[in-house]
Amino acid sequence: MQLSWQVDQTDIAHVKAFVASQEGNLFVRARVARNLAQTKPTVDRSEFWKQMVGMRMTSVQRSGPESAVAAFLRKNPFPLSYDQIAGVIDGSERVALIAATLRSHGGIRFPDKIADDLARNFDKLEDNHEWATALAELNNLVVPVNAGQERQVARYFQQLLHGFGPKQSRNLLQSLGLTRYEIPIDSRITKWLNEFGFPAKLNATALADAGYYEFVLDGFQALCAASEVFPCVLDAAIFASFDGDGWTEENTIY
């Protein structure tokens, strides 16, 4: 069965006006500059690991400009760098180090669960040369590709990484500046779409199901295509509309 998304001129005008209202926001400008660049820096283990740590932390907790998560990700040097974690040989000690680091920062929910997921992901990447495959998948996206190719990479990381469902896998790719079409759909996006008049009432909890998630994302992408707006830009505009001018050049990290 095929579903045809119908987008009318009123919908298009609404999207264009909304994006225009946020285009001066520094968060939106940073998203445009990074994610719509024609060529992007190659992703290495260190950068991927840092963003994976950060995006795992954003699950089920606040991640706005003044949040504990954002403050943690702005730390320099990064407290849980790849080299630091790789230097711990014992798996249980690795879990303990991650959990203790998160606790000492303060304000991070579920430190033990996050630590366990990250340690398991480290092991998976180190075993069976999975790093080579993971980095190859990522670096296929350093030049513009189509929406289908982005989705295949998102599905790969969704299956590979512990603690990364449909939203977090796309959050990871977007945080690396690699995606234009595949976006992390959260309660902000569903609230905006429901108010916009999305044809089905959306439930943020149901987005944990990959099929439902991709159904909603298909509709979001169809709306963007008709409006000639990249999904990552509309996503940034929605995000900015909730946070106002809280994001600055110094604290923009996503």
Residue spans of the language-model regions?
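Structure-specific DNA junction-binding interface
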Residues: 1-108
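A basic, often C-terminal nucleic-acid-binding module that engages the phosphate backbone, implemented
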Residues: 207-254
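Alpha-helical ds-nucleic-acid-binding substructure associated with the helix-hairpin-helix region
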Residues: 79-160
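Short, well-structured alpha-helical segments
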Residues: 70, 112-119, 154, 166-174, ...
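Catalytic DNA-binding helix-loop module of base-excision-repair DNA glycosylases/AP lyases
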Residues: 57, 147-201, 238
